[in-house]
Amino acid sequence: MTVPEIFDVIVIGGGHAGTEAALAAARIGQKTLLLSHNIETLGQMSCNPSIGGIGKGHLVKEIDALGGVMAEAADEAGIQFRILNSRKGPAVRATRAQADRVLYRQAIRQRLESQPNLWLFQQGVDDLVLEGERVAGVVTQLGIRFNARAVILTAGTFLAGLAHVGSANFQAGRAGDLPSNSLAGRLRELKLPVGRLKTGTPPRIDGRTIDYSAVAAQPGDAPVPVFSFMGNAASHPKQVSCWITHTNSQTHDIIRSGLDRSPLFSGAIEGIGPRYCPSIEDKVVRFSAKESHQIFLEPEGLTTHEVYPNGISTSLPFDMQVKLVRSIKGLENAHITRPGYAIEYDYFDPRALKSSLETRMIEGLFFAGQINGTTGYEEAAAQGLLAGINAALKTQDREPWCPRRDEAYLGVLVDDLITRGVTEPYRMFTSRAEYRLQLREDNADLRLTEVGRRLGVVNDARWVAFNIKLEAIAQEQNRLKTTWLSPKSLSETDALRVIGKNIEHECSLHDLLRRPNVSYAELMTLPGAGEPVVDLAAAEQVEIQAKYQGYIERQKDEVARNAYYEDIRLPQDLDYKTVRGLSNEVQQKLNQFKPETAGQASRISGITPAAISLLLVHVKRGFSSANTKKSA
């Protein structure tokens, strides 16, 4: 049957990408349908029970600044919070939350069900409806047809998913869920560039069988951080510790003895796994000189005894999993509640996408999440948010929003995917961002909330709070710049305590704050400094902006210089074989990937600065058919 009502946007998949996509499209005001094979697993944390981390936390903050829900859900479900790299500079500091799986899923479900313009329906999707070269809807497993102007595919690991435990394998999207084989077959028929990737998960352990006296406690931070800019530590549930143990030589010997039974080394697994989250057998082989590997024992929630042993992802046979787990200190009597496994799945070359995450081949079809070759909840959610925004904008006949590399980690993520592609699952790190000093966690709202308001994804409450914060920052900066201390007004004791030496001439509080060893909190204890700003987030911004002002200005100058290439649009009908002087390799790559700007072209592997110069000369002369038409 065909459902008579037409949706603006249909989202396939209810994981981290799908939920953010559906919510974003609905917030913009478009009639949105979220299809999932099981409504009970919406927002499911399929692997590790945590949100954030280095690079990943930055994405979560950006999602939050744009009105997304991942940070809010993490605040409501987080049972331990830590700031990573807290002793390093603000550019690389990152928030990480250990989450209760059940509470996280509940937080996501509640937001989905209370979002206007959003409908949920429990059905897997078997087919896409195409009209010429554009998508027109989907067909579910029961043959129900839903029509839409845009479709977002967020299938995770479900496309032709195949799970492995030793020599055994079974079809699955994840343990306990069937794969989407019909949809995978349909996508392959469309001749989209497809490949196989692999990921894995460790065995789960009954916490009652762990000897906690033999492992080291890792408590969270105090005071407890919050993830969302709208968050409050009072909303956090009970806080608990994680625990740390290590593998040893016996563990490694057990793993080596079972490598011939590992699907990873027997050739049974074709997909390539994540470099930065390897299986324990991969770590033992690749780092053979290393005597031990750190294992984090992470509680799965407040109402379960299950523990997630982060660091021993494996697809070894179950009997080997039992041996390796029980060889680890504190786990000698551990009971495994669920075996670890590897899963391989279809992904599609993200170089076949536009910056908006719309496919180049099929108009109105968007991809987000692991289908694009990424790994991680945060990377998926960020893509889902962007795809949801752009799908909604497309149905409103508005221009897409494509964040730049200097604007957001989301911009770095998408640009890396569509210009460089992936040969292994892509995860975000701060090192991937060349402008990371201005892409900090702490200023994600200052960078993106105004953009989100213009796009329609930021609600009134967030907008009001954002403007109050902006005003507090501006007022405090002005106060510090106009409040002066003289050598006579500052005692030697106070000067040495806060500044480290006597001041020789009259200084503004802002000048003193720019000194590396002077903190805002200490500065406010000086006589005559006045009352500190009440908003701690505003105080943090005042201090960071003062201390890093020179560095940030230099980075902004660099961005401005490089913006020249980012602003030069390349005609999508340009045949690069007509550009004189380009090598055959460069012509082939440019024709294959069709970069949207000269900046994108410059980041494609094998494209030299000389090739970009030739390309710019060609475009400026108006040799493309598009430019010819404009001049006619």
From Swiss-Prot:
The keyword ATP-binding does not apply. One of its GO terms (biological process) is tRNA wobble uridine modification. Transmembrane segments: none annotated. The keyword Cytoplasm applies. Its cofactor is FAD. GO terms for cellular component: cytosol. NAD-binding protein involved in the addition of a carboxymethylaminomethyl (cmnm) group at the wobble position (U34) of certain tRNAs, forming tRNA-cmnm(5)s(2)U34. Homodimer. Heterotetramer of two MnmE and two MnmG subunits. Belongs to the MnmG family. This is tRNA uridine 5-carboxymethylaminomethyl modification enzyme MnmG. The lineage of its organism: Bacteria, Pseudomonadati, Pseudomonadota, Betaproteobacteria, Nitrosomonadales.
